[in-house]
């Protein structure tokens, strides 16, 4: 499978922006060809890929107004990437921030969590995952269905089969058990 994957934006010395991709992604997708996307420049021809992954990292801007955005270049790039994938019917996997951004870009809403998840282990229906987020889905974008919620009702996995999109609230690339990794890879194959 040929996979394009967005990278997190980081600020280093002298206020210079850098694009970064965790090495865990290479381990998670070791059987596939991975093409990192720096979130700058031209949107790739998405129909040349079997899957686009919008990764985590970078906090979301204000969830009500979408202002105070510290990563406007990444947000605009990923918004255009979603539009292009819809035109070419290229499947998208949104992970953590990627899931929340995808939901927002397609008409869903979010709310702040009373108690943010900071490396918090949460129980899903058949397995546990470790989550890192301070916002949660309030309403899913049209066409998405809840696949997994945690024991507090936080949506951790949603699917839109008609648009070929899967949103995951945790980081499957960091999962230590093979069941969780296999579960996500199997869902990707249904898109």
Where on the chain are the PLM-derived regions?
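Active-site-proximal beta-strand elements of phosphoester/diester hydrolases
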Residues: 129, 166-170
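N-terminal beta1-alpha1 cap of cysteine-dependent amidohydrolase-like domains
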Residues: 1-97, 103-104, 116-123, 134, ...
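Beta-propeller blade-edge signature
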Residues: 125-127
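Post-Walker A helix-loop "phosphate-sensing" segment adjacent to the P-loop in P-loop NTPases
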Residues: 107-111
